[in-house]
């Protein structure tokens, strides 16, 4: 297996979720061993995707460096992870990645348009070697060794529409596009009203978010799938795990996890070299195993 980038540049314009202003997003190819690099084109600031550059995880995963910030990176990164892209330049002219329809579907379509190009260098994959768990009250995220990437997520909301949902997702690009990519972000009307009162969620609408009142979904079209709520959490987790800098082989499990816990998990993995091994696809046996895991 070889490292990849996109075949040619692509771009789109969309609205930022919190500021509600138009944002131009440009994806450009990068050479081998460059990784995922964000760029604020309006400020001329480069923001490499590294755990130490994650500066906020309250409402979204936020990248920051030299007084420049880029918020809501997780949906795009989730698609990048699913497509196995190792090297990519992501430029925006404002401080948010466009929310689009609230899922990763638009970004999958954009990557399909860009095409995937193999580079000369061998692909690197992180294999988890021992279990790591992060807890906050009854909430937790955990990752442990496995020969593939799987995500097991459970959510439990005191709401009649959501209640308790669980989904076990074994990664493949096809399964991601069928089960996960279309799952939209969601929020509660009371929270949306509060966020707007403090100058946030200005770009949020029924076109890019599932909104719930006390008893029901306000979106007339309803849900895209029965487990859309928990599948969106899996979408987010795949984006947050991309901060590791490469695809990961491991069994991820979460109960009511969050961007904050995912970020803490990423940092905990990298804090001790005994937690992981970087596999380089140079010998046939490893290459076969990696191809099977990331089909």
Curated annotation (Swiss-Prot):
Name the cofactor(s).
Zn(2+)
Task: Alphabetically list the UniProt keywords.
Answer: Hydrolase, Lipid A biosynthesis, Lipid biosynthesis, Lipid metabolism, Metal-binding, Zinc
Give the reaction(s) catalysed: a UDP-3-O-[(3R)-3-hydroxyacyl]-N-acetyl-alpha-D-glucosamine + H2O = a UDP-3-O-[(3R)-3-hydroxyacyl]-alpha-D-glucosamine + acetate
Q: Which GO terms describe its biological process?
A: lipid A biosynthetic process
Keyword Acetylation found = no
GO molecular function term, any single one: UDP-3-O-acyl-N-acetylglucosamine deacetylase activity
Active-site annotation: 259
- Highest taxon of source: Bacteria
Query: Which pathway does it take part in?
Result: Glycolipid biosynthesis; lipid IV(A) biosynthesis; lipid IV(A) from (3R)-3-hydroxytetradecanoyl-[acyl-carrier-protein] and UDP-N-acetyl-alpha-D-glucosamine: step 2/6
Gene name as annotated: lpxC
Protein name stated in the entry: UDP-3-O-acyl-N-acetylglucosamine deacetylase
Q: What is the stated purpose of this protein?
A: Catalyzes the hydrolysis of UDP-3-O-myristoyl-N-acetylglucosamine to form UDP-3-O-myristoylglucosamine and acetate, the committed step in lipid A biosynthesis.
- EC number(s) per UniProt? 3.5.1.108
């Amino acid at each position: 297996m070889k490292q990849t980038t996109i075949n040619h540049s692509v771009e789109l314009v969309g609205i930022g979720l919190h500021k509600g202003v138009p944002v131009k997003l440009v994806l450009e190819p990068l050479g081998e061993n460059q990784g995922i690099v964000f760029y604020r084109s309006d400020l001329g600031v480069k923001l490499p995707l590294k755990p130490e550059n994650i500066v906020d995880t309250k409402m979204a995963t936020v990248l920051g460096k030299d007084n420049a910030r880029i918020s809501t990176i997780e949906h795009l990164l989730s698609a990048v992870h699913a497509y196995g892209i190792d090297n990519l330049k992501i430029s925006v002219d404002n401080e948010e990645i466009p929310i689009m329809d609230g899922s990763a579907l638009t970004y999958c379509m954009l990557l399909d348009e860009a095409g995937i190009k193999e580079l000369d260098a061998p692909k690197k994959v992180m294999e988890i070697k021992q279990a790591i768990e992060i807890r906050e009250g009854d909430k937790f995220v955990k990752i442990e060794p496995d020969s593939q990437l799987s995500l097991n997520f459970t959510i439990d909301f005191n709401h009649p529409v959501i209640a308790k949902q669980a989904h076990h997702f074994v990664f493949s690009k096809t399964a991601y596009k069928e089960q996960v990519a279309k799952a939209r972000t969601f929020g509660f009307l009371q929270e949306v009203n509060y966020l707007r009162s403090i100058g946030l969620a200005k770009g949020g609408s029924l076109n890019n978010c599932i909104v719930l009142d006390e008893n029901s979904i306000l979106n007339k079209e309803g849900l895209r799938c029965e487990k859309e709520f928990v599948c969106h959490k899996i979408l987010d987790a795949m984006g947050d795990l991309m901060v590791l800098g490469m695809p990961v082989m491991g069994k991820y499990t979460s109960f009511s996890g969050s961007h904050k816990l995912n970020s803490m998990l990423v940092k905990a993995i990298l804090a001790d070299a005994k937690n992981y091994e970087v596999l380089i696809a140079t010998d046939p046996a490893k290459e076969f195993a990696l191809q099977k895991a990331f089909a």
